[in-house]
From Swiss-Prot:
Annotated family: Belongs to the class I-like SAM-binding methyltransferase superfamily. TRM5/TYW2 family.
Coiled-coil zones: none
InterPro entries, A to Z: MeTrfase_TRM5/TYW2, SAM-dependent_MTases_sf, TRM5-TYW2-like_MTfase, TRM5/TYW2-like_N, TYW2_N
GO terms of biological process kind: tRNA methylation; wybutosine biosynthetic process
Species assigned in the record: Danio rerio
Signal sequence annotation: none
Pathway it works in: tRNA modification; wybutosine-tRNA(Phe) biosynthesis
Nucleotide-binding in keyword set: no
Gene3D superfamilies found in the cross-reference section: Met-10+ protein-like domains, Vaccinia Virus protein VP39
Name this protein carries in UniProt: tRNA wybutosine-synthesizing protein 2 homolog
Amino acid sequence: MDVVPCLKVPQRHAQMYRKYLESQGVLDRRYGAEKHSDGTVTLLVVASALPQLDLVALKEHVAHDSFCEIVDIQAQLSKKSKVKSVHMKLVEAARSFLLSKGKEWSEDLGRDIPGRWQCHGDLVLFTEGCFSNAVWKEIGSEFWTAVALTLGVKRIAQIKKISQDGYRTPIVTMLLGDSSHVTHIDNHIRYEFDVTKCMFSSGNITEKLRIASFDCSGETVVDLYAGIGYFTLPYLVHANAAHVHACEWNPDAVAALQRNLEINGVSNRCTVHQGDNRQLSLSDLADRVNLGLIPSSEEGWPVACRLLKRSTGGIMHIHQNVTAPFHHEPSELNSSVEGSSVEVSPLRIQKDMQVWTAWASETAKRICTLLLGITGSEWKTNIRHIEHVKTYAPHISHVVLDLECKPL
């Protein structure tokens, strides 16, 4: 392990510090953040940036009620760096296995080996588009045993495609092992589900961490697209919401959600509503509505407007895949826009942010119109924050709009 300079911050503010350092181009991404027993987290900083790092200004900009200091620690390579080395081990294992069976190796086969995958306990889930060459089927199950040994797991599965059944049910093939039930622990929350019946959105980890940092004490939250509890559970376990109404129409996801509420000890603070959320009979009770559906949650906007408290209003967290001009370069960092100001990262994501802000402004106007039509009174909307979750393609970004809605 290397001794490297890092920024020591409180764990509850670590995500905000990480995102800011990343946006300024001074986060050393070769190393992962480390949690410590004293409730702090260390974030690795590029050594050349240390002389220009103003800790007082940094604290005031990110979280004025926190603390930060520079310390030296022995740091391990980040998961991303480790995955690269594991990928090379996987390529070498596949090559050695094929050669041992008298098969020829080629660069095309090397490109057929995935560089990314999901881990759920002792099960690895590969996505579609890899191991597509016919040779992998020809060499049989012994090959998957070798892959499992290389990755340190016992079971292997692969998503072939996503069903168009309205539930986004994954079509998954078990390549090694019989049971498809898994346990996934994410930010101290335990999720149990069947990989052949339910999706797990591992790419949404930054949004789940952001929700976990909210203070929802005393609030009633409605999660319109709950799934197995991706966002419902962070609201309950970490954000301390008084009560969450979780809506989900996939029966398999509902079963997993109810199980996950039980095993995390929060079922007494959650009401599960199975079925189409557009038929939900609730109204005038929510301080916060989560609309976590992509590519668009637009069908849920009228429902969310009906759910907000008429007397005090509340906040909508509106997910959307926003398309930027195709020629524009992809954004590589999670980024944010707050109020009317645009924060520009070193990776030139300003044009993306302009597109997100334009979408958010139009959405805010439409929500105002919907609220007027549903409640019969005027409302004011305020763009509190735009969160960039991830980029799917060079021109498609998953963003979340935090929209404050207040009656006039």
